[in-house]
From Swiss-Prot:
Phylogenetic placement of the source organism: Bacteria, Pseudomonadati, Pseudomonadota, Alphaproteobacteria, Rickettsiales
Name of the protein: Peptide chain release factor 2
Pfam families: PCRF, RF-1
Function: Peptide chain release factor 2 directs the termination of translation in response to the peptide chain termination codons UGA and UAA.
Positions where N5-methylglutamine occurs in the chain: Q251
Gene, per the UniProt record: prfB
Keyword Cytoplasm on entry: yes
Intrachain disulfide bonds: none
Family: Belongs to the prokaryotic/mitochondrial release factor family.
InterPro entries named among the record's database cross-references: PCRF, Pep_chain_release_fac_I, Pep_chain_release_fac_I_sf, PrfB
Length: 365
């Protein structure tokens, strides 16, 4: 076994021990026993909301314990196999094991990042909103590119489920706005640092003179609320509009005014839903979205970051950019908060975002 491999294995053992402490494995086992006792109670379903939350927490703890156990076993087994292959001078076997070691290293690093998700809503599902900036067709097309990027990131790289809650098509191409519901373990924790303005520089495919254009779109991520939360919304503070849900080219999703748009006047937050044919269901979905947005603001207040949250929400422009995507005259995607850069723009636009997210989370931790 060469010295470099020894160092990697030593560091991975340290990382697994750090993960053990951060996850507080012993405490999780104790909590699991407590929940099991509550679940076994005959009065469990007298409060259905509480019962569902308990069962979800139980499932999350079981998954966390299982993943950590598998990670520990994989590392122990790999160390043993590497030591045997090194002792017997099996070079081909060592090459295969080194490839496995790299894959395990990535998995352990990802788990270390997940351990940094200490916010009270980091484990929740989330709403990811995309809104095109000024610029019409150019910005609408950029917003559509971001929709594809985030959908692939969620579904392919994290195996999250993605549901389109609301989508407004552009007049010629692309989208004016779209709201995604991203569902999965730590969905909000992974997505929350994407809130901000994203800038694209490229040769426009819509310009006959092939001139360079700059487009903007903003992303806003808020946690989905689980159970009841103390968010007070006064009916007199709401402006509720109904409209027909429709797509590009006049292709109506349905012919009745079932889509709902709610404006929260004090905060100027606007939410809308057209995912259902039922106006009642769309209103309930929109109200849940509004609560999530207001909850996000409360979380930001606790972290003394309210100004950043509202500035991002209210402004699209140079001042609040978090990431620049340059396709011409050179190719580079750069995060302006951390300085992290990636030259493989195709990979990033195809959903390979984790290096940016990890850099930002690590920088903030």
């Amino acid at each position: 076994m060469d010295f470099e491999t020894q160092v990697v294995l030593h560091n991975l053992k340290k990382s697994v021990e750090v993960i053990r402490r951060q996850l507080d494995i012993e405490k999780k086992h104790s909590r699991l026993e407590e929940i099991q006792a509550l679940v076994d109670s005959p009065t469990l379903w007298e409060d259905q909301s509480r019962a569902q939350l308990l069962l979800k927490e139980k499932s999350q703890i079981e998954t966390s314990l299982k993943e950590f156990k598998e990670l520990s076993i994989q590392l122990d087994d790999l160390i043993e196999m590497i030591e045997l292959a090194s002792k017997d001078h099996e070079e081909e076997t060592m090459k295969d094991l080194e490839r496995e070691l790299l894959l395990l290293k990535e998995k352990i690093q990802k788990k270390e990042i997940e351990c940094l998700f200490s916010g009270e809503a980091d484990g929740n599902d989330c709403l990811l909103e995309i809104q095109s900036g000024a610029g019409g067709t150019e910005s609408n097309d950029w917003a559509m590119m971001l929709l594809r990027m985030y959908t692939r990131w969620a579904e392919i790289y994290h195996k999250f489920q993605v549901q389109i809650v609301d989508k407004v098509e552009g007049e010629e191409t692309g989208i004016k706005s779209c709201t995604l519901k991203v569902m999965g373990k730590n969905a909000y924790g992974w997505a929350r640092t994407e809130t901000g303005v994203h800038r694209l520089v490229r040769i426009s495919p819509f310009d006959a003179n092939a001139k360079r254009h700059t487009s903007f779109a903003k992303i806003f991520v808020s946690p989905c609320i689980e159970g009841e939360i103390n968010i007070s919304i006064d009916e007199k503070d709401l402006k509720i509009d109904t409209y027909r849900a429709s797509g590009a080219g006049g292709q109506h999703v349905n012919k009745t005014e079932s889509a709902i748009r709610i404006t929260h006047l004090p905060s100027k937050i606007v939410v809308q839903s057209q995912s259902s044919r039922s106006q009642h269901q769309n209103k309930a979905e929109a109200m849940q979205m509004l609560k999530s947005r207001l909850y996000e603001i409360e979380l930001r207040k606790k972290e003394e970051k309210l100004n950043a949250a509202r500035n991002v929400e209210d402004s699209i422009g140079w001042g609040y950019q978090i990431r620049s995507y340059v396709l011409h005259p050179y190719q580079m995607i750069k995060d302006l908060r951390t300085g992290h850069e990636v030259g493989n723009i195709t990979s990033v636009l195809d959903g390979d975002l984790d290096s940016f997210i990890i850099a930002t989370i690590s920088n903030n931790s």
